[in-house]
Regions:
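Active-site micro-motifs of SAM-dependent methyltransferase domains
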Residues: 62, 85, 89, 169, ...
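Short, low-complexity N-terminal intrinsically disordered segments enriched in polar/charged residues
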Residues: 38-85
């Protein structure tokens, strides 16, 4: 009986405090909103952010391969979805040479000139081993590149390297602000013409 009495007493003492607690919570919420906060929990929003940032690697590969097929304007249009307007993009080649451009239009022209100059008729960029670290509206991302550049039916150039990206969230969208490609290999693979053809079973 004494225990129940103490419980009732504790509850009765707590009830008058509820208005004060409610006011405190309301004040905290108002301050949070005024400071530009959202009600998304960090644990819930980070996976979404990482997924959106990872999609930027796909965006870039699709844009580059559009240029590889000869459609330079389509590639540039795709690039605009991947990068900020003032993005800086750098390629560092295995021999130590490098090229840096600002803006997707300039970078698209550079990519097109490299592809045309080497006689590529198609390209395929595969991206993997993606690592992302998000901090507020900024993020860093690294990813591995394996790219095939087709010269002819018997000759391809293969590039391998690492992309290092600085990513920023602008107007609710993640975009790459700075990208550096560090190539470790750029090799030509060729084979003599062959009469062997891929065998495809008939139905």
């Amino acid at each position: 009986m004494e225990k129940r009495k103490n419980q009732r007493l504790a509850i009765s003492n707590f009830i008058p405090r509820l208005p004060g607690i409610t006011a405190l919570i309301a004040a905290v919420v108002a301050l949070f909103v005024l400071l530009g906060g959202t009600f998304e929990s960090a644990l819930a929003s980070q996976p979404n952010a990482e997924s959106e940032i990872e999609q930027l690697t796909v965006c870039y590969a699709l844009g580059t391969d559009a240029i590889g097929k000869g459609d330079v304007q389509a590639g540039k249009n795709i690039y605009r979805d991947c990068f900020t307007e003032d993005a800086t993009i750098t390629a560092i080649f295995p021999d130590g040479g490098q090229a840096t451009y600002t803006g997707t239009n300039a970078w698209g022209d550079f990519v097109a000139s490299v592809f045309r100059g080497n006689g590529y008729v198609a390209t395929q960029h595969l991206i993997g081993t993606i690592n992302i670290a998000v901090q507020g509206n900024n993020a860093k991302m690294t990813s591995y590149l394996h790219a095939t550049h087709k010269r002819s039916e018997t000759s391809i150039d293969v590039a391998n390297g690492t992309y290092e990206d600085e990513v920023v969230k602008q107007n609710g969208r993640w975009k790459i602000r700075r990208r550096t490609l560090k190539l470790i290999t750029f090799l030509n693979l060729s084979s003599p013409p062959s009469t062997v053809r891929l065998s495809i079973p008939s139905r």
